[in-house]
Curated annotation (Swiss-Prot):
This is RNA-directed RNA polymerase. It catalyses: RNA(n) + a ribonucleoside 5'-triphosphate = RNA(n+1) + diphosphate. RNA-directed RNA polymerase that is involved in both transcription and genome replication. Together with VP3 capping enzyme, forms an enzyme complex positioned near the channels situated at each of the five-fold vertices of the core. Following infection, the outermost layer of the virus is lost, leaving a double-layered particle (DLP) made up of the core and VP6 shell. VP1 then catalyzes the transcription of fully conservative plus-strand genomic RNAs that are extruded through the DLP's channels into the cytoplasm where they function as mRNAs for translation of viral proteins. Its EC number is 2.7.7.48. Keywords: Magnesium, Nucleotide-binding, Nucleotidyltransferase, RNA-binding, RNA-directed RNA polymerase, Transferase, Viral RNA replication, Virion.
């Protein structure tokens, strides 16, 4: 257990290394006698340190505490002022500082100049182009690296090499930072003008990225890649990532497939030993040479050399190095441009009249027909969601910005806020709520903009549209998505599939007479040429749909939707440029509408169909699959003859020429063996994912706390690790220590222990063992979990005041009235709670809750107080089960080939033994009969928590619940009286438990939990018919077996003899499980 605690203690003595520094460990125990000793020990420690006496004697005297109790936290205090970083840094700053090239980037402000050259005065200064947007500082990052280096300077053998590589790279960073001095951050972890004016503008974000990269160096190759990226990204803040990652789109087409996995009829992956040769025309090699030349022009040497060497034999065995380069390129950090440049980027494309009108017509018609196909059924059947579209929209309204700040009155409280949900309430209270009028976004009311920053691409703008647009689009989009869910062409939406299924789909039809065409259409989505045909196609589809129904409300829904499209054809945006706000006519499609994802998918499908219909005039082929996935589309074409170099080249040129006829600036490629799209790439018949999540720089600031961000950091580290980019774990743990520590006063700090941060409680941040989610069952673990549950949710005065106001109450009761046919407390309370939770995105409320949370936490970390609780957690259930299992050794042979080469060995081993899964386990209850019944008659969507509560009520209460939601009495009676109801009980419980156990997150999402190989390691004699109990016993056993295998690389077998008498007790308990939300579960959700 104690690796984290050990590092923590070492870290504290590294940071506070002066005479005046003291570390006081705080222990706790669930055993009351030992707990008394813990308290005694603590007070004596405090007394001794106050009087400047040593604590050594106490450690001996209280050895019973130190050996048997659990470490809760470490209290540390130190009176030295905090310029320790600068002092320590000097030791490493022995190299030559980097000099930034001042003309490397096209846009002046993207050059890494001294801040005062870019922003002559404090008024002009903005940190928005270099803000790391993370609640940890450069000085903490430097400390974490120096701590690691000091700790490892006596390493030997291979470890010594790693130390030397990192030391060498850190010398570059330290020397450069030291030349200008370490920039000091303010309380919000921002870097102000006074601090930055005499330093290079991008110093902080560059140093963060560089630290992230150097702490991810293990091999010599890592070192070469990192050194090159660190040195060049100091000057090149614009195109470096793009240059380095461009070749991948061609590299995937060069590797022969020798055995691969394909999707079979049952949608499972099955091995196929087919051989497919990579057929590569010379033109492709010329394009690749050009890319490598561009890299060399930009000053890269080692990376192009590695690619060049790999090209000699293009083997899949050495391909992971290419994958590594591709992933590393993203870690140079986000490219953050000025909004004006981001907007003008899309408007720079010259508009030509010289386009193929015939193709545009076909494109528009395909969009129209697809829209009709998606909505035909719900419209013809006067679907209730389309009738009550406004209510549905209100219920799922987010608390994001509505584009302008307004003064709002809630009772006696007046606040300023930009949040949609508050604006809706305020408008309703003041009679300004008119969802039937879609406000124009023309020159009189231009659209405010948000931004999306991503490494290696230009900044994109996002429309922040008035909430009326959301309400008008919500229901129609939801219906389209339901259609897309059972249409395989829409890879992104396709029912519960994951990326492995899409992988098997592509490899399935690859053969010597097939080629795959893959296109990145992100340029097209935001190009001007797309906007008219795109919106017109949708409008025409809506017009046709309106003629299929006589229901006035459905027609109204379709008309409002149509109005959003009409308004957006004449859109202006407002862009702050300095202190003026520029209005620009913006004729392209931007994200920000509810329809963005769905409509782009429709358009991209229409686009590739248009192109294929053109080239089918010239070639004869069968289209085996067409897929669209976000900004990418791909299709596998099967010819009647074997594919030759000439064919590939001709098809490739014809496809490009076809796109050019629509003036679509897209990157279209043709290959016989692999594809590369934004989300994944396939090479040599294996699947790869880009491990490009930045750890020490964030895209934007939200209202998450340091604890939340520590959990997100860990979660990002895990995702990268699964995808083949590993950062030193000790470094990650050090960051977690820094980010979860709580300041009491200037010189007093409290550092939570591993137990606090890894126990499944409302404060969980990480797992003590990567990839293994532990649910503690020891006395001390359950004790601390209870203690934390008592202080989980904090009150906020502001929130209570708003919730008590008539504005808020009337809004909530209006929603309930529209939704319910009779009284239903569960739903009414649910709506009120949801609406109250939305208030959290209003900063003053989240700050107030955070303060309350921290003061409660401070008390708890010094002395945990438990409370008697009737609440049962998943831990309690597992604790009851555990004693009845007996373990024995077992053996499982490796029987599947590798298909995801980047996985860590211990995870790979498990997949090779038990197989992988291509589907998401249903964990939201949406497949249950009750959920389907509700969605048939009501727009209300109960959460899995609510379904779990409802399904365990008495039958007559369930009937009332259903009837109040508008389900006809006869249907409600039938449901409760049928077998389906008892199946539902089981099904919902199953979903709920899967949800609690995070079965679709981390590496668990890769394992086949229904594998017969896994099943045969588990023996549970069947007693009595309680399926729910059998289920939880089996699931627990599977997790135990898998966790053991991840940890030890070997298998165990479990035998369970669960007494019949206990079964009914356990079954009763299973209907009272409380779900725990923590920074850790939020981070998992955030990944999604």
């Amino acid at each position: 257990m104690g690796k984290y605690n050990l590092i923590l203690s070492e870290y504290l003595s590294f940071i506070y290394n002066s005479q005046s520094a003291v570390q006081i460990p705080i222990y706790y125990s669930s055993n009351s006698e030992l707990e008394d000793r813990c308290i005694e020990f603590h007070s004596k420690c405090l007394e001794n340190s106050k009087n400047g006496r040593s604590l050594k004697k106490l450690f001996t005297e209280y050895s019973d505490v130190i050996e048997n109790a659990t470490l809760l936290s470490i209290l540390s205090y130190s009176y030295d002022k905090y310029n320790a970083v600068e002092r320590k840094l000097v030791k490493y700053a022995k190299g030559k500082p980097l000099e930034a090239g001042l003309t490397v980037n096209e846009l002046d402000y993207e050059n890494n100049k001294i801040t005062s050259e870019l922003f002559p005065t404090a008024e002009e200064y903005t940190d928005s182009l270099m803000d790391p947007a993370i609640l940890t500082s450069l000085s903490s990052n430097l400390n974490a690296v120096m701590f690691w280096l000091e700790k490892h300077e006596n390493d030997v053998a291979e470890k010594l090499k790693i130390y030397k590589r990192r030391l060498d790279l850190f010398t570059i960073v330290a020397s450069t930072v030291n030349k200008y001095g370490v920039p000091r951050h303010n309380a919000k972890y921002r870097y102000e003008y006074e601090v930055m004016k005499d330093k290079p503008y991008y110093l902080v974000t560059w140093a963060n990225s560089s630290i992230e990269m150097l702490m991810s160096v293990f091999s010599h190759e890592d070192y070469l890649i990192a050194r090159e990226l660190i040195v060049l990204s100091y000057s090149n803040r614009s195109t470096l990532a793009k240059l380095v990652s461009s070749p991948m789109s061609i590299l995937v087409a060069l590797v022969d497939i020798n055995g691969t996995f394909i999707t079979n009829e049952e949608l499972e992956l099955e091995f196929s030993n087919k051989y497919v040769r990579a057929i590569v025309p010379d033109q492709t090699f010329d394009e690749l040479k050009q890319m490598l030349d561009n890299m060399r022009k930009a000053g890269l040497t080692d990376i192009p050399k590695m690619i060049q060497e790999w090209l000699v034999d293009c083997s899949i065995e050495k391909f992971p190095l290419m994958a590594k380069i591709y992933s590393w390129s993203f870690h140079v950090g986000f490219r953050k441009q000025k909004m004006l440049d981001a907007a003008l980027d899309q408007l720079k494309t010259e508009y030509t009249e010289d386009v193929d009108d015939e193709m545009y017509r076909e494109y528009t018609m395909l969009i129209r027909d697809e829209v009709v196909k998606m909505l035909e059924e719900p419209v013809k059947h006067d679907d209730h969601l389309l009738q009550d579209s406004e209510l549905a929209g209100l219920l799922s309204m987010s608390s994001a910005s509505n584009g302008e700040s307004r003064q709002l009155k809630f009772g006696r409280k007046t606040i300023f806020s930009t949040k949609k949900n508050m604006h809706v309430m305020d408008d309703m209270a003041n009679g300004r709520y008119t969802p039937g009028i879609i406000p124009p976004v023309n020159v009189d009311k231009p659209i405010p903009l948000g931004r999306r920053d991503v490494p290696g691409r230009r900044t994109r703008i996002i429309f922040i549209l008035p909430y009326e647009y959301f309400i008008a689009q919500h229901a129609v989009v939801e219906k389209s998505v339901i259609y897309a869910k059972h249409t395989r062409e829409y890879a992104e939406f396709y029912s519960q599939s994951n990326q492995l299924l899409s992988y098997g789909d592509v490899t399935r039809f690859l053969s010597n007479n097939a080629m795959v065409l893959y296109t990145d259409v992100s340029q097209w989505d935001s190009s001007q040429h797309n906007t008219q045909p795109f919106r017109k196609g949708i409008i025409m589809g809506l017009d046709m749909l309106a003629n299929m129904t006589n229901d006035a409300r459905v027609i109204q829904t379709l008309n409002l939707y149509k109005q959003t499209q009409i308004n957006l054809m004449d859109s202006y945006v407002q862009i702050p440029d300095g202190n003026v706000i520029k209005k620009i006519q913006y004729g392209a499609v931007a994200s920000g509408e509810k329809q963005t994802k769905a409509a782009n998918s429709i358009a991209n499908l229409a686009l590739i169909k248009t192109v294929l219909s053109r080239i089918s005039n010239k070639y004869s082929f069968a289209t085996k699959i067409i897929r669209v996935d976000g900004d990418d589309n791909y299709a596998v074409l099967q010819f009647n003859t074997e594919v030759t170099k000439q064919m590939v080249q001709d098809v490739s040129n014809d496809v490009r020429e076809t796109y050019a006829r629509m003036n679509a600036k897209v990157k279209a490629l043709v290959s016989t063996v692999g594809i590369e799209i934004a989300k994944r790439y396939i090479a040599g018949g294996k699947i790869f994912f880009r491990a490009g999540i930045n750890l020490l720089n964030n895209e934007k600031r939200g209202q998450s706390t340091q604890w939340d961000q520590a959990a997100v950091l860990y979660s990002n580290y895990i995702v990268n690790r699964l995808r083949g980019f590993e950062t030193d774990r000790e470094f990650i743990l050090t960051k977690i220590m820094q980010m979860t520590s709580v300041a009491i006063t200037g010189s007093l700090r409290l550092f939570p222990s591993e137990r606090v941060l890894t126990t499944n409680s409302t404060f969980k941040v990480f797992d003590s063992e990567d990839f293994i989610i532990e649910y503690g069952t020891t006395d001390d673990e359950v004790y601390i979990q209870r203690a934390f549950m008592s202080l989980s949710s904090q009150k906020s005065g502001i929130a209570d005041e708003i919730a008590a106001s008539s504005t808020f109450k009337n809004y909530v009761s209006k929603l309930s009235e529209q939704l319910l046919f009779s009284k239903n407390n569960i739903v009414s309370r649910g709506i009120a709670l949801t609406e109250k939770a939305k208030l959290n995105s209003y900063a003053p409320i989240s700050l107030e809750k955070r303060r309350a949370q921290i003061s409660a936490l401070l008390t708890m970390l010094q002395k945990p107080v438990t409370f008697k609780s009737s609440k049962i957690t998943i831990n309690d259930i597992l604790r009851d089960i555990k004693p009845f299992f007996t373990v024995s050794e077992a053996h499982l042979p490796i029987q599947y080939q590798k298909f995801m080469p980047t996985l860590p060995d211990n995870v790979q081993y498990i997949i090779q033994c038990i197989g992988s899964r291509t589907y998401q386990i249903e964990d939201d209850g949406s497949k249950s009969a009750i959920s389907r019944l509700i969605s048939k008659y009501s727009v209300y969507k109960p959460s899995i928590e609510e379904l779990y509560k409802v399904i365990s009520l008495h039958e007559n209460e369930i009937q009332l619940y259903l009837i109040s939601l508008g389900i006809p009495k006869i249907d409600a009676d039938t449901y409760v009286g049928s077998k389906i109801y008892s199946q539902d009980k089981y099904r919902i419980l199953e979903s709920y438990v899967y949800n609690l156990l995070s079965i679709n997150y981390g590496c668990y999402q890769l394992f086949d939990f229904n594998s017969p190989d896994l099943e045969k390691l588990i023996r549970i004699p069947f007693k009595g018919k309680i399926p729910a109990v059998t289920f939880i016993l089996h699931l627990y056993a599977k997790l135990e077996v898998i966790n053991y295998a991840i940890k030890n690389g070997s298998w165990i077998s479990l035998f369970c003899n669960y007494p019949k008498s206990e079964m009914i007790k356990l079954w009763k308990k299973m209907w009272n499980i409380t779900s725990l939300r923590s920074p850790y579960t939020n981070a998992n959700f955030f990944q999604d």
